[in-house]
Amino acid sequence: MWYAIEESGDIMSKKKKKAKKKNKILTAFLCLTAWFFGTVLVVLGGFLFLLYLVQLGPSPRIRDLFVASAKESSVGGVMVDLFLSPEQVEEIMANNSTKEFSEITDTTMVKIAYANSESKDSSSQSSIGRLDNPEDPDGDGITVYDVHGPTYRGKMMVVFDPSRVKVGTIDHYGISSPGLTLPDMVEKYDAVAGINGGKYDDEAGIGTGGMPQGIVFSEGVLRMGDPTSNYEVYGFDNNNVLVVGHMSAGYAASIGIRDAVTFGPALIVNGKSARMAGSGSGLNPRTAIGQREDGAVLLLVIEGRQTTSLGASMADLVEIMENYGAVNAANLDGGMSSSMVYNGEEIVSSCTMRNRKIPTAFIVERRD
């Protein structure tokens, strides 16, 4: 009898210990859950308070810069709409915009100076086409410069022979079709360099990169675009002159456009720089293309949304292109797509953890 009572007591003691252990685990779990959600609420509350201060605080300049930058991104516009009315946002964007050009490129202003450096009669060539070109010490026809300003850093690639610059594109277009990353696009064409290209469908920043928007000419073929519809056309004609302007796809074909995409805005047309309200835009990663009077092509990519490089405005792009002698220049797709590849290396990277898939790119062919 005594043994039975003792055994029963042991069982009860063990049950109590198990219950206490379960209670401790449950208490720890509840505390951890409360801490996690409390931390999330504090962080979220702090973030919303920061957005409130930026958008409704004492500095209109910071507010305008934030709004203009966020509205240019795929998903950032949601943050802007939390505290500002549509009318306020529209006014801010209008006060930081780039005016459209009504004219297109006068191709007679560009005189292609490049000549084949292997020509026997090198005495008749411009220095831009010879091996002793001071801008091209290694003789590969490409020079890359570092560019930087108060809010940005990036690279300017100068390609001395404009006939080497083409539009690379994927084989099939479609909303569900996958695009190619820039390194893969450059590899597809066995090119030596490349930058991202034109506009494409990217709803909420999660698109497949397989559907261009606007116009696409690649190696003389109209791959995308209605011949009767008007587009912003940025690309090269059969004389290797960069053409910048608003025109129909049919007109573009009639003037011999061989490689072109759509984006915008135009930055410089016929030596005239775009007129701007405010800074012309927000600060973001940027990609742009230009051409000098001697025909050399300017490929510019600016890093952004990083602690070391917030990004560039349209006014910054115009200034850079002016400094490098552009007579025509245009803004291309930017943001998370902005990147530059050279000799198999991504020398300017996207601001995301992974490379974006895109349908078009300006690629630089290898020399024969």
Explain the meaning of each model-derived region:
Residues 200-279:
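Active-site-adjacent helix-turn-beta-strand microarchitecture at beta-sheet edges
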Residues 170-177, 248-252, 302-306:
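Short, solvent-exposed aromatic-acidic interface loops
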Residues 160-163, 235-241, 269-270, 291-295, ...:
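Short acidic-glycine loop/turn motifs at beta-strand connectors
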